UniProtKB/Swiss-Prot annotation:
This is Histidinol-phosphate aminotransferase. It catalyses: L-histidinol phosphate + 2-oxoglutarate = 3-(imidazol-4-yl)-2-oxopropyl phosphate + L-glutamate. GO terms for molecular function: histidinol-phosphate transaminase activity; pyridoxal phosphate binding. Its cofactor is pyridoxal 5'-phosphate. The lineage of its organism: Bacteria, Pseudomonadati, Thermodesulfobacteriota, Desulfovibrionia, Desulfovibrionales. Homodimer.
Length: 373
């Protein structure tokens, strides 16, 4: 007789055993401690080059005494403000603890392990794959073209009647590519009828012409589309974790039902409301980012780097020397950018747009390191 197997309190699901966690960019404190530096510039995580809105800062000070309160369930004030900002029905909007929470909820609500699959490009934002695999789902990827534009034929070929969600990021991360809206319309019409097309527009604010690149204003024509946005980038609230999805109303209702209560805390909600009102700060963010993008692209090109066109608040480039060597040399000078080995691009790097002084320091350091270019 075979003895029954004994489980232990620390046993976990099979998906957890070989799970590879998300790897964030290095922090300023890490590099200060490692190299004994007093001044470190971080251009690795696509954060706001101007920091946090002064209006938001004042709001957080004023509202700090509310920290003992739970936020109102579903964050209706914030939901209405987001809806008004985009000209959509409030019933479509779901706020989350970063848009990552919305990604996770969509996967868990839409997809059944052993039945459904998830599709995205390769490379892509790693959270799509991480959460799909954590949920025990098949994750399929279509390769980008050699120039890092989207191969939609390969993308559509990866889908079938069991594809629960097809994810695309536009502008893309890490390349910065942003396809015309006509391509997105074609994909939305061609995907299997049961597939939800999730368009992650975390960086759309920076593209310069949303009407030419976003389907957000045409959702009524495409019932299979969900759009994700974030407060982390142009609104400068990355540390407060606030994002949202604009979804078909029925799907939005399901997400509200199953989400953890109070995942958007009361101070994040107040900050989001203030950020939406501070149009001056956001406009200045977009201006500084566009100027920095042009400056860094020109500077890197002059140094012999292969620079990809970008519609985002970052640039992907391939240096004329070993990418790891350049990355580490920049670290020693107190400048953090993002190596892309985890994206399968070991010879490429990604640099976020900083303020004017940070951008100059980055290019000056590259000139020191790449004098032969």
């Amino acid at each position: 007789m075979t003895a029954p197997s004994m489980s232990r309190p620390d046993d976990v699901r099979p998906e957890v055993l070989d799970f590879k966690p998300y790897v964030p960019g290095l922090s300023i404190d890490e590099i200060r401690d490692r190299f004994g530096l007093a001044d470190v510039v971080k251009l690795a995580s696509n954060e706001n080059p101007l920091g946090t809105s002064p209006v938001v800062q004042r709001t957080l000070k004023t509202k700090a005494d509310l920290a003992f309160r739970y936020a109102q369930s579903g964050n209706p004030r914030l939901t209405r403000a987001i809806a008004a900002h985009h000209g959509v029905a409030p019933e479509r909007v779901v706020a989350g603890n970063g848009s990552d929470e919305i990604i996770d909820l969509l996967i868990r609500v839409r997809a059944t392990p052993g039945k459904h699959n998830i599709v995205a490009f390769r490379p892509c934002f790693s959270i799509y794959e991480l959460q799909a695999k954590f949920c025990g789902l098949e994750f399929r990827q279509a390769d980008l073209r050699p120039d890092f534009t989207f191969d939609w034929d390969a993308f559509l070929a990866a889908t079938d009647e069991n594809t629960a969600i097809a994810f695309v990021t536009t502008p893309d991360n890490p390349s910065g590519w942003c396809p015309p809206v006509s391509e997105l319309e074609h994909v939305a019409r061609t995907l299997p009828p049961s597939c939800l097309f999730v368009i992650d527009e975390a960086y759309m604010d920076f593209c310069g012409d949303e009407a030419a690149h976003s389907l957000l204003s045409r959702l009524d024509a495409f019932p299979n589309i969900a759009v994700l946005r974030t407060f982390s980038k142009s609104f400068g609230l990355a540390g407060l974790r606030l994002g949202y999805g604009i979804l078909p109303e029925r799907l939005a209702d399901y997400l509200h039902r199953v989400r953890l209560p109070f995942s958007v805390n009361i101070l994040a909600e107040e900050a989001g409301l203030a950020a939406l009102e501070d149009t001056v700060f956001r406009s200045e963010t977009l201006r500084v980012t566009a100027e920095g993008r042009a400056y860094i692209a020109e500077g890197l090109t002059a140094l012999g780097c292969e620079v990809l066109p970008s519609w985002a608040n970052f640039i992907m480039f391939r240096p004329p020397t070993d990418a790891t060597d350049l990355f580490e040399a920049l670290l020693r000078r107190g400048i953090i950018i993002r190596p892309l080995k985890s994206y399968g691009l070991p010879q490429h790097l990604r640099v976020s747009m900083g303020n004017a002084d940070e951008n100059r320091r980055f290019i000056a350091a590259c000139k020191e390191i790449l004098p032969h270019a």
